[in-house]
Amino acid sequence: MTLFSSISSISNPMTSSKSSIASFGSGTSMGSNSIACGGGCGGGSGGILGLGLGLGLNLFGGSRGACGGNSGSGNPGNGPCSGGKCCGGPCCGI
């Protein structure tokens, strides 16, 4: 499964793991929709929490693909919610 290969790549000690922790708080405090959305938004480029909390979020292109824009790693965001907010994308429409 692609899930396992994704986990392998993010298991590397990147700064994204640190930023994903901060993004978890940011995502949950948003309270806009689900934790999965917040985790994915802030997870940045393959953040561990972005994948772990996002659960099925990676199906939409990884943690930064769903609600990109709010990513702690400085990603501009290339997802349906590139403004950093939940705007009715696949991650936010739930």
UniProtKB/Swiss-Prot annotation:
Domain of life per record: Eukaryota
Pfam families: Coiled
Region of interest: Disordered: 1-20
Biological process, per Gene Ontology: sorocarp development
InterPro entries: HssA/B-like_chaperone, HssA/B-related
PANTHER family: HSSA/B-LIKE PROTEIN 1-RELATED-RELATED (PTHR31059), HSSA_B-LIKE PROTEIN 1-RELATED (PTHR31059:SF5)
Family under the similarity heading: Belongs to the hssA/B family.
Name of the protein in its database record: HssA/B-like protein 49
Source organism per UniProt: Dictyostelium discoideum (Social amoeba)
